[in-house]
Amino acid sequence: MARHQRVVLVDTNIILACWRNGAWRALTRGYAVETVEDCVTETQTGFQHRRKEEQVDRAQLVGSLAAPPRAVSDADCAALYVRAPDIYLDQGEKSLWAHALSRADAWVLCGPDRASLRLSVRLGLCERMISLETLLNDVGHSVRGGLKEPFTTKWLSTRLSEYVVLEGGSK
């Protein structure tokens, strides 16, 4: 399968999963990976509860991104809220989606948060969701022992199909 050339927007879950599995370098060398400041901040919380391999070095993270982490305006967050006031997103996902919707270029979003997936269906953007498994496979990187289920292509497809039914739309 040919690797896409769009910007890859990642949430905190993806950053932590890549760090935990030694896949961050493969991801950032294979794609133009970007995120928002709130997701970077979330990677820095809870250090005392994480194993060493899950502790993200902020300078290394920021330095490996294709662009500096984006700050998101209150206006962009408000525009997102108006489109889906009943879907609760964590701060990182909310900022990531607000940023994504403000972009004029082509992008895909990688993040297994269920509310985020539901939002993608609600907004008619589920084709922009991509699994970590797909991204890593496309750059030829395999994770020893495999990825946890929420990072797989099958899991993503199943969840999106469920939300299409719940939202009454078409995938």
Language-model features, listed with the residues they occupy:
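Conserved SAM-binding loop
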Residues: 109-110
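Active-site-proximal, substrate-binding regions of enzyme catalytic domains
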Residues: 2-105, 114-171
